């Protein structure tokens, strides 16, 4: 159990990218504020800044509106899926520098209640020359007040929380119980197509144990872009990948929980 102001912490959260259909990855202040206000109206109380720090205005709004933030380091670890040793000598110093930047930038932000070492870290036990454990230790050595999250690393990696992406309801239920590590779903219920239909079952499992810290749905708003097409009078949404003509990208349009 994690306690804040005498009350158990329970994330009813969402992952959030900096994205806008018109402005792309430049997000104006009014979009930030609309995001936070809409989250509050949806009974969302937490944001995982996937997968990097945001503009300082987001943290100001999180403080203002009373939102919890999982402060995530700008570290994408898909490259280590197979423990690629040639990558390690280049990746580790760069990633440790980003870890330091994340900490120094966010350490005084009231809304940041948990550190996250980055994204997709469960594919390997500890790739890139002990990178994961060193990132975890960096935060723990400098901040004893906030728990540290690192997906899939668990107690052996030195984290304060157990965590998975997209576990089954049964797996979540198995994680609940007295004496077990605090557990959080850093991503679940991918809101794509005909999805998000079993939130009740997930939350029945989450609420069944005092060690459960809640969950962050993937994800907040669609990452598509509004573009015009020849001979068509309206704008159409595509992903910001290489080309909307790639069939595998079609399914990423309108991949979100919010239609604001």
Where in the sequence are the language-model features?
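Substrate-binding/catalytic cleft of secreted carbohydrate-active enzymes
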Residues: 36-42, 46-253, 257
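N-terminal carbohydrate-binding accessory modules
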Residues: 1-39, 60
């Amino acid at each position: 159990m994690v306690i804040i102001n005498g009350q158990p912490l329970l994330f009813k959260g969402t992952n959030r990218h900096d994205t806008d259909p018109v402005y792309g990855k430049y997000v104006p202040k009014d979009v930030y504020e609309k995001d936070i206000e809409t989250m509050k109206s949806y009974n969302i109380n937490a944001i995982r800044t996937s997968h990097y720090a945001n503009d300082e205005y987001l943290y100001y709004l999180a403080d203002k509106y009373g939102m919890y933030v999982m402060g995530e380091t700008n570290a994408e670890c898909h490259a280590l899926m197979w423990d690629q040793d040639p990558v390690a000598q280049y990746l580790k110093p760069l990633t440790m520098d980003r870890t330091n930047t994340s900490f120094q930038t966010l350490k005084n932000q009231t809304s940041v209640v948990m550190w996250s070492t980055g994204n997709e870290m469960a594919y390997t036990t500890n790739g890139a020359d002990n990178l994961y454990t060193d990132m975890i230790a960096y935060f723990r050595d400098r901040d004893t007040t906030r728990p540290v999250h690192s997906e899939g690393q668990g107690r052996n990696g030195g984290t304060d929380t157990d965590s998975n992406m997209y576990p089954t309801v049964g797996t979540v239920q198995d994680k609940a119980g007295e004496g077990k590590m605090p557990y959080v779903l850093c991503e679940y219920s991918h809101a794509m197509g005909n999805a998000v239909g079993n939130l009740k079952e997930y939350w029945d499992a989450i609420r069944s144990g005092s060690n459960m810290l809640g969950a962050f749905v993937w994800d907040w708003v669609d990452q598509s872009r509004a573009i015009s097409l020849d001979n068509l009078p309206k704008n159409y949404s595509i992903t910001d990948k290489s080309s909307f003509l790639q069939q595998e990208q079609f399914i990423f349009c309108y991949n979100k929980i919010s239609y604001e």
